[in-house]
A protein has these predicted regions:
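DNA-contacting surface of Y-family translesion DNA polymerases
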Residues: 8, 62-63, 203-287
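Short, conserved phosphate-binding/catalytic loop or strand-edge motifs used
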Residues: 96-101, 167-170, 201, 220, ...
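Short, low-complexity intrinsically disordered segments enriched in A/P/G/S/L with frequent Arg
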Residues: 128, 133, 145, 150-151, ...
Length: 287
């Protein structure tokens, strides 16, 4: 099965962005006392994912701590998704900060993969942002080649776009703002470290066996991988070989909802208007 040509929009450090904190401010999002995301400013001070909260604060005393809030991340990402859907429907939200779509129709309509990627980057960059760092945001201050680059630094949402064969390769392409030509995903993936699979136990085992890159893993016979590492290993092996069989599951945009009520004669009393509004609210809820 041929991997689906896929576009990915990636907004770096999204949990930090969703909290309304800019990239230069040293900040970290914490869950279960460990850093799950951090800003570029924090990385510059030695903070990284997986560190315990106390160790992160030891490396960067000025670190702003943000409590993990998946709901906030999802709500803040909606303007980005709406911007993507303004160009094409059937967008999959892989997770807040990362969405994907199959490019076959959109690329044909907008003049090819490269044109689509550039347009998407510019469109997302102009997405409106209602995000404001509020007291209840959870932030605690210390006092408390053949590939085309498509990068956009404008607007409120820093984002990068990548296109490749399959969702896995497209996500890695987005991290480099690249359009990988059709059929070249295996070569593109080969130099990446085995950690790119985001399967820590499998990656640790492979590294102990001397297999440190996706290319080295992809070179192993598929039957041997299945026998040694089981179905999970076989699935990871397909990804490393650029044979990502996962289809993009685009969400169906919700229908436009509206209700109306004609008052004849017009309401002259507040209680009459309030009763009509209550009736409309009930009808809207039923939809």
């Amino acid at each position: 099965m041929t991997a689906t040509r896929t576009l990915v929009v990636w907004c770096p450090d999204w949990p930090v962005t969703a909290a309304g904190i800019d990239a230069e401010t040293p900040a970290a999002v914490v869950f279960a006392n460990r850093v799950v995301a951090c800003s570029a400013g924090a990385r510059g001070e030695g903070v990284k994912r997986g560190l315990r909260r106390c160790e992160a604060q030891g490396r960067c005393p000025e670190l702003v701590i943000i409590e993990h809030d998946p709901g906030r991340d999802a709500r803040a990402f909606e303007p980005v998704v709406a911007a993507v859907e303004s160009l094409t429907p059937r967008v999959e939200i892989v997770r807040p900060g990362l969405c994907a779509l199959a490019t076959r129709g959109p690329s044909r309509y907008f003049g090819g993969d490269h044109a689509l990627a550039r347009l998407m980057a510019d469109t997302v960059a102009m997405a409106p942002t209602p995000i404001v760092l509020a007291p209840d945001s959870g932030a605690i201050t210390p006092e408390s080649g053949a590939r085309t680059e498509v990068r956009s630094g404008k607007g409120a949402f820093p984002s990068q776009v990548g296109i490749a064969d399959g969702l896995f390769a497209a996500e890695l392409a987005a991290r480099q703002s690249l359009v990988v030509p059709a059929g070249e995903s295996p070569q593109f993936l080969a130099p990446f470290p085995i950690d790119a699979l985001d399967r820590p136990e499998l990656a640790d085992l492979l590294q102990r066996l001397g297999i440190r890159t996706l290319g080295a893993f992809a070179a192993l016979p598929a039957t041997d991988v299945l026998a040694r590492f089981g179905p999970e290993g076989a699935d990871a092996h397909r990804l490393a070989r650029g044979r990502d069989e996962r289809m993009v599951a685009g969400r169906q945009p919700p229908p436009d909802l509206s209700v109306s009520l004609e008052l004849d004669p017009p309401a002259e009393r507040v209680d009459t208007a309030a009763f009509a509004a209550k009736q409309l609210a009930h009808e809207l809820h039923e939809q």
